[in-house]
Design a protein with these regions (language model features):
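Positively charged n-region of N-terminal signal peptides that target proteins for export
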Residues: 1-5
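Bacterial N-terminal signal peptides
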Residues: 7-16
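Sec/Tat signal peptide C-region and signal peptidase I cleavage site
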Residues: 17-21
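Flexible, processing/modification-adjacent segments and terminal tails
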Residues: 22-29, 89-154, 160-162, 172-176, ...
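N-terminal mature ectodomain segment of secretory-pathway/periplasmic proteins
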Residues: 25-98, 126
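Pepsin/retropepsin-fold aspartyl endopeptidases
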Residues: 123, 157-161, 169, 183-621
Length: 621
């Protein structure tokens, strides 16, 4: 009976699969007929589209080769970008004229974008897999997921009456999603119906609209149309092949002094999780820089408004200059309050990619090497990385109670303070709250909940992490409960941050797609388990020396010492707040067994709290 039941179930499943496959082929056949698709592309074609992108006048030139080659150039009012895809491999010239070779998820997505362009120009061919078929939510459409060779799946919504695509949907890097809508279908010069209006609705950008200005069939394929991209002039100036930059560690973030357009140096956060560079919009007037365009960023938390800047020059110690840069702009006031130091912006891919970067955490030195002359002389652990829009990824393996070899596609995030933060979908899919959770109370950074970097996490311990030849054990980790931002996405498993990297001497070798780890004595020491005095602090005021208690954990040592939310710490052991930084205050609060005297302003009155610092493993407010 059991065998018969199994056979019946299997037969039903096979019948269902066959029916779905037949349905998809019928939908595709109707789609081809509706757009008058031809068996083979008649020739190479060239589109010119005009519209607006990030509130900027924009022209896109798109070339499609009959043999599958693809090229697209996007010219906005103040910047441009170009991609060439040949033989399944790609090149990308960014807004600074730097040419790179995409790989990993980014390459897969570019292959799918080129495939989508061919589908719209010539109709759907047979060179893809139909991964899924379902009915649209309103019942008037069918939804097909089409995946080309080496690409990722795009969802296409097909109208059941016209059999034309209504829209397509793709997931982008770090969980961003874009829906593209198609309208005004009419005949092209080569006979196929094409959409003359395209609307792009991106999850973290201003909606964009493009209309076809010209669609041309090219009789012959000019070699220049798909030639390799040529980089612009180098944007790096170095007085020698090696430069040494000092840095400080602020709340486990590397902060480097940088001069912007010749102005006095200010701290910039070093962040591999940033795809370009960023300027603090709140300080741009002091740099003499104006923004252009309009977009949004979400980072690990809430979405906030953003824009762009151009003609930016970054000056570093030891004679290093990065010139003629385009950057994003964003309000970094929240970062300043969290770190307690003035922040000019963020240094991401557009800085990191120009060098091989050596990080000596013990000496707090960053050594920049010329990638054309540098070669690795050591025997460290080499871990390969891939990139998605300039963000590096590892392929890690985890050991958890039910799976000793769980794969994890993780961001190599040197801008993250913690050890590992797992995304909410990865936590749910692998039952991590139950399997490795140590404190399931979800905590947020009180006072900064609406910032782009805001997170909502509970805590756990991973028994083992394997990163190439590196093995780390008993690692305290964060388990995200975010429903938005990067940690709310299921595109990657999580981020690995500074708590792990700072145990090593590190080389970031972007030109060779690798990060090298040299062991130090710290790498052999057990991880410190999470303990806290029970206070959350931010730095307020123009000088960032007004230290405000934003939360006190219930039943914590801080609560027992009579600290309260909204307290202002005006002095420590008789030293006024103007004489020390937020990092100094945090260091004192981590010195278990030390006696401290805090002067507190509460309700306009001063009072003293004398206490011995005790750390506990309870909730972190």
């Amino acid at each position: 009976m059991k065998a018969s039941l199994t056979a019946i179930v299997c037969a039903a499943l096979l019948s269902s699969v066959a029916a779905r496959a037949a349905d998809s082929q019928q939908i595709l056949a109707q789609w081809r007929a509706s757009v008058r698709a031809r068996a083979l592309p008649p020739s190479d074609v060239h589109f010119v589209r005009q519209g607006s992108d990030d509130s900027l006048p924009t022209v896109t030139d798109e070339w499609l080769g009959a043999d599958g080659d693809y090229r697209v150039r996007t010219d906005r009012k103040f910047d441009s970008d170009e991609i060439v895809l040949k033989g399944g491999q790609a090149q990308r010239r960014d807004w600074d004229g730097y040419v790179r070779v995409p790989n990993g998820d980014e390459l897969a997505r570019l292959r799918s974008e080129a495939f989508a362009a061919r589908v719209l120009a010539f109709g759907p061919s047979g060179e893809f897999a139909v991964r899924d078929i379902k009915a649209g939510a309103d019942g008037c459409c069918d939804v097909l997921t089409l995946t080309p060779p080496g690409g990722i799946g795009f969802e296409w919504t097909i109208d059941r009456k016209t059999h034309l695509p209504v829209s397509s949907y793709e997931l982008e890097g770090e969980g961003d999603a874009a829906t593209t809508k198609y309208a005004d279908w009419s005949a092209s010069p080569w006979g196929t119906l094409i959409p003359h209006r395209i609307d792009v609705i991106d999850s973290d950008r201003v909606p964009a609209t493009f209309t076809v200005q010209s669609a041309t069939s090219l009789e012959a394929k000019p070699d220049a149309d798909f030639a390799d991209l040529v980089a612009g002039p180098s944007d790096v100036r170095m007085t020698s092949d090696t430069a040494v930059l000092p840095f400080t560690m602020e709340a486990k973030h590397i902060v480097i002094p940088v001069s912007v357009n010749g102005h006095a140096p200010i701290g910039f956060i070093f962040d591999t999780g940033d795809e370009s560079e960023g300027l603090n919009a709140a300080r741009m007037s002091s740099f003499g820089i104006a923004s252009y365009g309009r977009t949004a960023i979400s980072g690990g938390g809430q979405q906030v408004q953003s824009a762009y800047a151009r003609d930016v020059e970054f000056g570093f110690t030891d004679g290093v200059v990065l010139a003629n840069q385009h950057t994003a702009t964003f309000d970094a006031t929240g970062l300043e309050r969290a770190l307690g130091v003035p922040i000019g912006g963020i240094l991401g891919y557009d800085f990191i990619s120009r060098f091989v970067i050596e990080i000596d955490y013990k000496k707090q030195l960053m050594i920049l090497h010329n990638p054309r002359t540098w070669s690795y002389p050591g025997t460290g652990a080499i871990v390969p990385i891939t990139f998605d829009d300039g963000i590096p990824y590892f392929e890690a393996r985890l050991s958890i109670p039910t799976n000793s070899d769980l794969p994890a596609h993780v961001v190599a995030d040197f801008g993250a303070a913690g050890s590992i933060t797992f995304t909410a979908p990865f936590v749910k899919a692998n039952n991590l709250l139950t399997l490795i959770g140590t404190n399931n109370t979800v905590t947020r950074y009180a006072g900064l909940e609406k910032e782009f970097f805001a997170q909502a996490n509970s805590r756990g311990v991973v028994p083992e992490l394997r990163l190439g030849p590196i093995v780390e054990r008993a690692i305290p980790v964060s388990l995200s409960a975010n429903t938005s931002g990067a940690y709310g996405t299921g595109q990657f498993a999580g981020t690995i941050g500074e708590t792990i990297y700072s145990r090593y001497h590190v080389y970031l070798d972007y030109p060779r797609n690798r990060i090298i780890f040299e062991s130090t004595p710290d790498a052999a020491t057990p991880f410190k388990q999470d303990k806290t005095f029970g206070l959350t602090l931010i730095a307020a005021g123009n000088d960032l020396h007004t230290f405000v208690v934003t939360a006190v954990a219930a039943n914590s040592p801080a609560a027992k010492a009579n600290f309260q939310a909204k307290d202002e710490i005006t002095a420590l052991d008789g030293v006024p707040a103007s004489k020390f930084a937020l990092s100094d205050l945090r260091n004192h609060l981590a010195r278990e067994g030390e006696s401290e005297t805090f002067t507190i302003k509460r309700g306009g009155k001063l009072t003293a709290i004398k206490t011995t610092i005790v750390l506990y493993g309870g909730n972190i407010p």
